[in-house]
Amino acid sequence: MDSGTSNSSIKVSRSPVHRIKDSINFLFPTSRRNSPLHIEQESKIDQLSTYLEELGHPLDTSQIEKLLELNAWNVREVAEHFSDLGEAEEGIIVDIQKDIVMLGCENDRMTSCYIDSVLFTMFARTQSFDGLLFVQAEGVNARVLQTHLRLFVNRLRSGKFINSYMIKQLRECLISCGWIGEDNYGSPTQEDASEFFLFLSCLYELPYLPLGMHLFHGASADANDERVITERLIQVSIPGDPMDETPVSLEEALVNYFQDSVVSGINRFDDDFKQTEVSAWQVLKLLPFYSASNEQGENIKAVESHFPTTNLILPLVLKRYGYNDNLQPFRINKNVYIPPFVNFNGFVNSDAADEPPCHCGIDVHYRLKLRSVVCHYGNKLSSGHYKGFTLDDEEGWFRLDDLDLNERVTKFNSLQGTTMLFNEFSRHGYLLFYELQRVHPGIVDEELAIEHDYHVAQNLQFVEFADKKNNCILQ
């Protein structure tokens, strides 16, 4: 039914819906009407009221009026929203559907791009984080937020538009769970996308990534020289002088993080059994599985089937932003060469793998495959703009720009488009989601041939870095 139709009946879906009224009461409290309604508007309120009564969840007239106002008095849109909300409340998650066109979401008050882009990269074309939507959340507020996250994901994957008032509802739920996303006057603010990812990861207990830490020094060996630490997000510094804009590669940054870190002020015993402070070379290696406990002995309720090791995602954040001596924010403007694949074999402790070794005489190698990227455009994380990018193995890359009113979700599946995206990643990439893959050396060449365009795009990106003007023109 379009907004101009008033008398058509609405087909009632009798899927069980629980606690929807509580959610609406929280988000849309009853209020008095300030101006009289037109006859057509009253008719639409009556239609929707009848529909909700048949569902068993009647609402006050003022609440129904508010919902219709936010949806341009389109009864069908509001009814569909309630149906989708009911499915989300029941825990239903829509599978990724390749045959639909994603419409994306609308920016809420010019400050929700960090939410929209992170959720798009986590859920649009990967199910690696779907376990966060299934976990048994503690507390009413966390469960209500989880329902609205499922609503966002389901509508995104179903090709339905997510309007700004749905994003507003989601933000209200986030704040009720402790997220600080507004100023002292209650106005919404833009926040750090990586902090938002961590907030969701902690709230819904994303399993930990265990890292084996080894300290090398000239003093006597100590039990603490080898231990396991855990992370949910790997924070990678950009090598070199922050003021030097010479391009670097992500591989260089990973080497610095995993293999080239010096730790000082460690107390160890020397050869004379005297305690002394030493500096140590720290080497980290990823243990290629998820962990349900951290180094403090805290355990989470992660279900292994929701987060299989075969679908492990390594989230990386590039530390492009910092503060100078005057506590003023600054951005590191050097390009970081973001490859579609990373040879990760040297950064993984394969002896600690949680699967039986292969006895066929073929070694298993580890590599990272780029799945999603959040780019930030601006000089500080609390301003500017975020866009989300995600890869579909069959269709190519998709970009979400919630400020693009003409085409919020755009597909890139040509060599020229892919090259443009990777150049954009090098300049603005902030939050990177890589999938850890186990590959046999014998089939790597075949896979590389299939994914030829991405490697050509990678090479063109490298050529651009070699150009002093950092400008690549495709013919």
Name each region found by the language model.
Residues 2-475:
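UBL (ubiquitin/ubiquitin-like) substrate-recognition surfaces
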